[in-house]
């Protein structure tokens, strides 16, 4: 089958699913049973048995809308645009439609960029809990330490499997919003991690950082006296000078004498992802400040909100973003 045929079939399947799936699994009262089921004599007890909160975590209408946005931005991309099945305007429309279920631009959750280590939030989630604002689709919240076992540095009994690269670290701007290569960045090569985008410290473990239940200091330098150092032990020590922090619970202890597990929130689709899909599509379609696809916000509005959430800018302004827009 061609890409065009596959795209058409997948979108058709999504549309068919939307005819039957609720936007969100929730219990209803007798007078809230959707008309198409009430007309067939369904009671609220029967409706709730099929579409109630006990089914949360399964595919619902909001997840399908997110799938459509993901597929459309893929189809509009340079890799598949020649198939002619979706434009960037189409992709923006699908993303905006999905986001409308979450308040549009209000889908930007102030704490959403740190969802994976929000202990009080995660510990309060049950199987039938409503998703946090940041999350469209998630897996079950369960106690584990497998991510930490894979990714903690070896001094903390981890395998150090994921090593962020230098170009990823360099992509994080300064706290004032400017790229580190910009003359206005005030970047200090001798203190490369000072005054950086707060997301750098939240997502990547750099030399001298602390992590783990015992707050162990990680020395990932080439002259490190520990196994955390650059290329100290094949298969465990970092090959780049960095270790992953994102997705990990910093309160997990892997010490064999006092091993602990913690609950994890596996986010499969986040509202931030769909917001960025919209921003990309809207910008490509009509530029940074156009409202596209029925949305009342632009690519610029999305990027500004996400950067502001992370704490970028100075004195409440984001001069670098204004230069770009």
Regions found by a protein language model. Give the residues of each.
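Short, glycine/acidic-rich hinge or "gate" loops at secondary-structure transitions
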Residues: 25-37, 81-84, 108-112, 291-298, ...
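Charged, glycine/proline-rich intrinsically disordered loops and linkers
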Residues: 26-52, 227-236, 319-322
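C-terminal substrate/ligand-recognition segments
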Residues: 193, 198-308
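An aromatic- and glycine-enriched ligand-binding surface/loop that stacks and positions planar moieties
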Residues: 7, 14-15, 52-232
